[in-house]
């Protein structure tokens, strides 16, 4: 007994040390604690919690540790305890809750009870702790306020506590919550019951019937939101934000009241900023999650806009602002930043059709206000709504731009800054139309603003706006301004370099260096004349700017040098390439000493990749130096944590952590530092593999080992995309090592790629993975997939197609929704486009499999056949029919003559769809009929005969050559050629040929153009009388066809077809008179094209 007491005493000391501010003591205590067996931990912790004479901090610490133990290691610890110990723990916890007098301690024990209850619901939903439920019911109707609080706290923490009995107890739960929400005497009970109600609704987010059943709790809930805010407690308001985010439909019956309350709280300046911003967050969140529902309440939206603008006016006067050299991060808690962000999101959520007419007048009034804060807010508001109101603002952009440019001359520097901001934002939001319309005014105004020497913040922001402008500016528009731009940028750079040396200021210089880089990037080879003006100074900065506070400047200068090098090309850059490489190598050697957050790292990594593009194969020599740090950065592992709500309260986003709510009181946290750098590094590895090919072979093994696991790196989309992109490129690099090495590498990636197609949650990333997988199969060819691969892939593709049809049905349901409007239709169209894009990737994968495996793969394909047949049904949307036909085109092209087995499914639709209203469907059908003639066996002959008049009808229709129809028409012309070439006995070739010649050349569809030119060569080389005409009278027409093909770049000079065409021309050249006659009938452009063909083929 004494030994146990001594051990418990030791444990109290340990708890004290776990709370120690001394890092060494605390670390040692954590190690000791970790080594105590789980069952002993439970005993010690419970004993500490029970002991009311122990220090308060130690008891609270014990409660937190016990909850964490049950949360993270329940299965290892609890089931192994003897059943009497389990029973004792359960009754002990309920006893402590009833006896505990300290409110905060009671809460912590309730958290333990909730955690235990969560783990005691079995797989069938049975609650294995009936005494816990009984305690809940007894306590909630107790006279003791502490016990009522405890019951609500447990229910809030674990709303699923009723398990499979929830439906049975639904009315009881509702009564319990209503009763507590009406408790006028105890605000804490009202607050807790409101939070518990929200938690319960959120836990049942897909149960629409339950929303209706609980709708009458909403008025009481909203009252609790209001009351708690005025008691300086925003927890219920946060619950309302969560409901707006996750289950906005629950709010529908009382949406007006919800919005009115949020509006009132947002506008009440007696509340603190955080509460007002949270109230605004309710409305803004609804504009994102229930836009159609909110659009019906235009009165609220109209009242919310002035509130956001009023917040944006809430700015501090700051004497040092204009010449601060360090850019402090925006104060994200400030009303001004919150208002601007809310406005941006609301404009995107609700759309410009609603928002712009409401806000336009407000902004115009603000811009005329004598107080600078209003003018600043008005301009920032214009910047914020550009993305959401894009379509509506485009129509009045001229007056907006003219007005904004006036404010670049405003007497107040912060207004001039905001005007730069608006110009920069519009240059991005409305590119390239903005640049095309306003280049003259904008460039002149920004260059003038950059001369504002007394206000470097304004100067720097004008340079930043210029960067935005030039990044998206068409090269041809920028060229006329180059002299003037360069002159200004150079003089400012020289001046700011002096200031850096004299005063140490660098803010403007950082931006100007990037402006130079951006101009060079757009101007490309036209920047050559200015190269020598900038390069010496830029090299000087990299050599000398070695102090810690100049790291960003140095990084940006490295970027600038590499972008200029890429712009001017290898020949001009070579004079400095060796110097620059030495500078970079020196930086690289110091790389290992750099701190992880050093801004130079990502600039360095990107610069190396640009140097690789400039130097090509010569870059290979630098790989040993570059690859170490690059792999180190690409291998960064982010800090992650699984936290429950209690732990969350001690964390904040300011520490660089971001959280995702997983429901059930759990959150997933990730420290985001280093993620962008990791993504950049992975993209650079892709760049090296692409540029260096076999020169990168030495590194393929380590890179593939890094990249394959990154297909599951769900913290950053860019990393997964780079991982996927790298796979086929790495296989190409590895080819030189021979088939065995290549196959080993493919085996290492294949499983992971197939699994990633099945599990990838983001459609943009998924399409990249599918595309890469298809490319890999093309590289590896026949035999690269085993039976297990085929089985898994078949299941995944089947699931993707089924999901495609299911999503279409869901969209039809949404079109019947009471809130359906034209903006909803726009977002449904976007979803549809996403789905179709995935369908194109399914087609890509099947194409690569058919082209590699031929007819051997048809038995496997049969599991997908009903779904592909469904795609080409007449009632399906045109993209479905287009891609369904493309898949059958591949079956015919690669699996004939065996493909005829499936002809009953696709032949009739294919013949029918040649005349479809949609050009994309016509094109896919026509291509199919062409490959049917080319590759199909004799069984297809009668269908070639049937196809011909249908194809001719499309070609001869009046609008067959318009932009949207031309590709389909050219496929029809090519198909007619293939029928004549490969199935000549199915049609009257003599009759069709003159028509076919009159339709040539093809110039849009380059692949089909080559096919038709090859057939034309066959006919000419065999001296076909109809083609050449009596006494070669058709030759001038043939020359004209060849010349047009050359002019439209339909003839690739490296293609054997080009040599055949050139030989036709040369033969005519030898018979003088005929040559003169042919050439005489060509225009000067056509003559030049014939000469170009002769020179190059």
UniProtKB/Swiss-Prot annotation:
Annotated stretches, region: Ran-GTP binding: 325-375
Residue positions where Phosphoserine is found in the record: 827
Positions annotated as HEAT repeat: 5-38, 43-77, 95-122, 130-157, 167-201, 210-246, 254-289, 298-350, 352-386, 390-430, 432-472, 475-523, 525-568, 570-615, 617-692, 695-737, 741-780, 787-853, 856-895, 903-935, 943-983, 990-1021, 1032-1067, 1070-1093
Domain Importin N-terminal span(s) in chain numbering: 28-99
Protein origin, superkingdom: Eukaryota
Modified residues (N-acetylalanine): 2
Coiled coil ranges: none
SUPFAM superfamilies in the cross-refs: ARM repeat
Family: Belongs to the importin beta family. Importin beta-3 subfamily.
Annotated function: Functions in nuclear protein import as nuclear transport receptor. Serves as receptor for nuclear localization signals (NLS) in cargo substrates. Is thought to mediate docking of the importin/substrate complex to the nuclear pore complex (NPC) through binding to nucleoporin and the complex is subsequently translocated through the pore by an energy requiring, Ran-dependent mechanism. At the nucleoplasmic side of the NPC, Ran binds to the importin, the importin/substrate complex dissociates and importin is re-exported from the nucleus to the cytoplasm where GTP hydrolysis releases Ran.
Protein name in UniProt: Importin-5
């Amino acid at each position: 007994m004494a030994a146990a007491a001594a051990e418990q005493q030791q444990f109290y000391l340990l708890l004290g040390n776990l709370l120690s501010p001394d890092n060494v003591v605390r670390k040692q205590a954590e190690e000791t604690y970790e080594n105590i067996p789980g069952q002993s931990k439970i005993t010690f912790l419970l004993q500490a919690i029970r002991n009311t004479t122990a220090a308060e901090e130690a008891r609270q610490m014990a409660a937190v540790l016990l909850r964490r133990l049950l949360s993270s290691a329940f299965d290892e610890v609890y089931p192994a305890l003897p059943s009497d110990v389990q029973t004792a723990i359960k009754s002990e916890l309920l006893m402590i809750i009833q006896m505990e007098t300290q409110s905060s301690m009671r809460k912590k024990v309730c958290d333990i009870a909730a955690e235990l209850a969560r783990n005691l619901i079995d797989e069938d939903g049975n609650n294995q702790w009936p005494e816990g439920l009984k305690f809940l019911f007894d306590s909630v109707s107790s006279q003791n306020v502490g016990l009522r609080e405890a019951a609500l706290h447990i229910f809030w923490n674990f709303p699923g506590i009723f398990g499979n009995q929830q439906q049975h107890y639904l009315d009881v739960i509702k009564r319990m919550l209503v009763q507590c929400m009406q408790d006028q005497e105890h605000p804490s009970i009202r607050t807790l019951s409101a939070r518990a109600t929200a938690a319960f609704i959120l836990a049942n987010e897909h149960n629409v019937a339950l929303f209706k059943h609980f709708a009458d709790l909403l008025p009481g809930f909203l009252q609790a939101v209001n009351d708690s805010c005025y008691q300086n407690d925003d927890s219920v308001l946060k619950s309302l934000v969560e409901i707006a985010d996750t289950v906005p439909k629950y709010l529908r019956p009382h949406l007006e009241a919800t919005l009115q309350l949020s509006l009132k709280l947002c506008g009440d300046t007696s509340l603190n900023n955080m509460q007002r911003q949270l109230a605004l967050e309710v409305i803004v969140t609804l504009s994102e999650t229930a836009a159609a529902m909110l659009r019906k309440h235009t009165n609220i939206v109209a009242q919310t806009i002035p509130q956001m603008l009023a917040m944006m006016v809430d700015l501090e006067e700051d004497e040092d602002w204009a010449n601060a050299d360090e850019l402090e991060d925006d104060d994200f808690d400030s009303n001004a930043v919150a208002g601007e962000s809310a406005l941006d999101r609301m404009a995107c959520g609700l759309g410009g059709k609603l928002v712009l007419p409401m806000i336009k007048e407000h902004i115009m009034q603000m811009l005329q206000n004598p107080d600078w804060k209003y003018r600043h807010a008005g301009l920032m508001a214009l910047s914020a709504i550009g993305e959401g109101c894009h379509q509506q603002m485009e129509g009045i952009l001229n007056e907006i731009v003219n007005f904004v440019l006036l404010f670049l001359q405003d007497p107040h520097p912060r207004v001039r800054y905001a005007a730069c901001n608006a110009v920069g934002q519009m240059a991005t939001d409305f590119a390239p139309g903005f640049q095309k319309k306003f280049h003259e005014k904008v460039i002149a105004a920004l260059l003038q603003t950059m001369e504002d020497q007394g206000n470097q913040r304004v100067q720097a922001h004008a340079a930043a706006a210029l960067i935005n402008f030039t990044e998206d500016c068409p090269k041809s528009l920028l060229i006329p301004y180059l002299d003037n731009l360069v002159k200004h940028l150079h003089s400012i750079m020289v001046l700011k370099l002096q200031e850096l040396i004299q005063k140490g200021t660098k803010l403007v210089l950082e931006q100007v260096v990037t402006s130079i880089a951006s101009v060079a990037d757009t101007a490309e080879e036209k920047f050559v004349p200015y190269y020598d003006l900038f390069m010496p100074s830029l090299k000087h900065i990299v050599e000398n700017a070695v102090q810690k506070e100049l790291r960003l400047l140095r990084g940006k200068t490295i970027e600038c040098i590499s972008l200029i090098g890429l712009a001017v090309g290898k020949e001009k850059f070579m004079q400095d390439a060796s110097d620059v490489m030495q500078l970079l190598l020196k930086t690289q050697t110091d790389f290992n000493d750099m701190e992880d957050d050093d801004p130079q790292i990502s600039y360095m990594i990107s610069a190396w990749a640009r140097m690789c593009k400039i130097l090509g194969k010569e870059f290979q020599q630098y790989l040993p130096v570059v690859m170490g740090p690059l792999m180190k950065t690409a291998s960064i592992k982010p800090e992650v944590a699984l936290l429950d709500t209690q732990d969350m309260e001690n964390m904040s986003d300011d520490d660089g952590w971001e959280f995702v709510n997983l429901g059930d009181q759990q959150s997933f946290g990730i420290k985001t530092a280093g993620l962008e750098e990791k993504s950049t590094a992975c993209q650079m590895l892709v760049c090296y593999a692409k540029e260096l090919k076999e020169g990168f072979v030495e590194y393929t093994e380590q890179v593939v080992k890094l990249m394959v696991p990154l297909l599951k790196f769900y913290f950053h989309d860019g990393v997964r995309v780079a991982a996927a992109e790298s796979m086929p490129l790495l296989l190409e690099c590895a080819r030189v090592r021979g088939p065995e090495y290549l196959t080993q590498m493919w085996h290492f990636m294949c499983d992971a790629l197939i699994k990633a197609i099945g599990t990838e949650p983001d459609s943009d990333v998924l399409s990249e993975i599918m595309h890469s997988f298809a490319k890999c199969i093309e590289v590896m060819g026949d035999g690269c997939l085993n039976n297990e691969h085929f089985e898994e892939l078949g299941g995944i593709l089947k699931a993707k197609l089924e999901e495609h049809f299911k999503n279409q049905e869901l969209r039809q349901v949404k079109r019947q929704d009471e809130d359906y409007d034209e903006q909803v239709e726009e977002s449904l169209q976007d979803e549809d486009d996403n789905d179709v894009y995935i369908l194109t990737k399914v087609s890509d994968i099947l194409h690569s499999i058919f082209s590699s495996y031929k007819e051997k793969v048809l038995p496997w394909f049969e599991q997908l056949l009903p779904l592909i047949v469904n795609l080409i049904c007449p009632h399906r949307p045109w993209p479905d029919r287009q891609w369904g036909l493309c898949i059958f085109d591949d079956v015919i092209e690669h699996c004939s003559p065996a493909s005829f087995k499936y002809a009953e499914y696709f032949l009739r639709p294919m013949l029918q769809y040649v005349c479809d209203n949609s050009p994309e469907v016509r094109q896919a059908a026509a291509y199919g009929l062409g490959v049917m003639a080319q590759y199909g066996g004799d069984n297809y002959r009668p269908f070639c005969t049937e196809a011909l008049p249908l194809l001719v009808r499309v070609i001869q229709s009046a609008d067959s050559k318009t932009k949207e129809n031309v590709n389909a028409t050219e496929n029809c012309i090519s198909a007619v050629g293939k029928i004549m070439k490969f199935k000549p006995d199915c049609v009257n070739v003599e009759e069709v040929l003159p028509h076919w010649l009159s339709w040539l050349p093809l110039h849009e569809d380059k692949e089909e153009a080559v096919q038709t030119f090859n057939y034309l060569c066959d006919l000419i080389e065999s001296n076909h009388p109809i083609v050449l005409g009596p006494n070669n009278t058709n030759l001038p027409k043939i020359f004209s066809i060849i010349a047009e093909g050359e002019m439209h770049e339909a003839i690739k000079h490296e293609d054997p077809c080009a040599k055949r065409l050139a030989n036709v021309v040369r033969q005519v050249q030898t018979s003088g008179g005929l040559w003169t006659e042919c050439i005489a009938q060509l225009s000067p452009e056509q003559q030049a094209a014939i000469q170009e063909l002769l020179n190059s083929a």
